Regions:
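A solvent-exposed interaction/effector surface
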Residues: 1-168
């Protein structure tokens, strides 16, 4: 059975409806940085998602090709995640949802630990060759968040501030 990050790391991927502390260890990601309204049709955010999944599935399906990744095991591609901020603010400032065009984001998909920077570079080149598309915006990113507060937000994005306030 394929390794499923959501099931194996429930504390990170299935947060409770009430705020809770969690220590997030260093993790490697595929990442694309951008700016703008994520709801814009064919906008930068939509394009970033396509790039991320293109490389993510190239790595996952490497088992069927000539490129062998040491330590590879079958897995479910982890969910899309993101780090959001608004232009001209810092991480502690509230987001103004009326101005989504000012969003600055880093969209990410977690990588299994067996994926090296060399495997990542191969996957970017392979995806570009197969899809006839530029994947140079995709980067290998290591993030160590450390001690965090998390809470499942249920509802429209415009009501997210209520969930964030509950974590204060």
């Amino acid at each position: 059975m394929a390794f499923d990050f959501k099931k194996e790391y429930k504390e990170f991927y299935l947060p409770k409806a009430k705020p809770a502390l969690v220590t997030v260890p260093p993790m490697n990601y595929l990442a694309v940085r951008g700016k703008g309204d994520p709801n814009e049709e064919n906008g930068a955010y939509q394009q970033a998602i396509g790039l991320l999944y293109g490389v993510a599935y190239t790595i996952k399906m490497s088992k069927k090709g000539d490129h062998r990744i040491e330590g590879y095991f079958d897995y479910v591609v982890p969910p899309l995640e993101g780090f959001w901020q608004q232009e001209g603010t810092d991480a502690t400032d509230a987001i103004d949802y009326a101005h989504k065009e000012q969003f600055v984001w880093v969209s990410v998909i977690r990588l299994p630990d067996f994926v090296t920077k060399a495997d990542f570079a191969w996957a970017v080149q392979e995806a570009a060759a197969k899809k006839k598309q530029d994947f140079s915006a995709v980067e290998f990113l290591t993030v160590e968040e450390g001690l965090c507060v998390q809470c499942m937000h249920i509802g429209p994005y415009d009501r997210e501030p209520e969930t964030v306030a509950a974590m204060d």
